[in-house]
Amino acid sequence: MKTLTQIISPIAAELQQFEAFFGQTLKAETEPMNSIMRYVLDSRGKRLRPILVLLSAKLFGEINEQTLRAATFVEMIHSATLIHDDVVDDDDQRRGHASVKAQFGNLSAVLAGDYLLAKAMLLIANDTDILNEMLRTTVAMSEGELMQLSGLNDYLEIITRKTALLMRSCCVIGAMSVGAAEEQIQRISDFGLHFGQLFQMRDDILDADSPENVKMAMELLPVYQQETLKLLEFFPECEIRKALKDLSVFCATRDL
């Protein structure tokens, strides 16, 4: 199986541009917020959501400044939700490092998450279609998290709201940023939703926190992987479609 670095090679240059823009955007005018933002940058994950934005944009056009803003916006939203989740779940570890909550305390973590959310909105305020897409998704994510905390047992609904809708929105706003046609946006939206569902199913299998969820995920994952790959057949053959296919297989079979 290809490594993630190999898979995303068609957008390697654009991903570097994203990293520079993301780092610049996170800078705060005061301490200690700037120190917390540097810590967030140093604790980076796979950047899967910006990768989806960039790949979806490049599938339909040329990556531009609006694409980079959209990718930065979505990573800021994602980072904020992780920081807040660690406060809610009382988790001291995130991506092999101390969580923001463990490193700086609950109050600072809540404020850091709020800072990221507010700054993300400022970044994309003039791109109203992208902003509205992400606001609807953020509402659904909050509802999904509360459904899980409340002990509700609708597995597919919870993972769709908690994870898959954000992945879907990444694909949608990437396509929007290059002026993709409505039908193209709908096609990549369908792909993104299924991709997000299979990603979370694999996560649940690896975490093994809930035997019921593991059983459900193991039953559903092969079906959703097949359907996700099938949805890519609507797009012309190209290196970006191949990258999305390889990324889907990677996320469905990864060990981390």
Indicate where each model-derived feature is located.
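All-alpha prenyltransferase/terpene-synthase fold signal
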Residues: 1-256
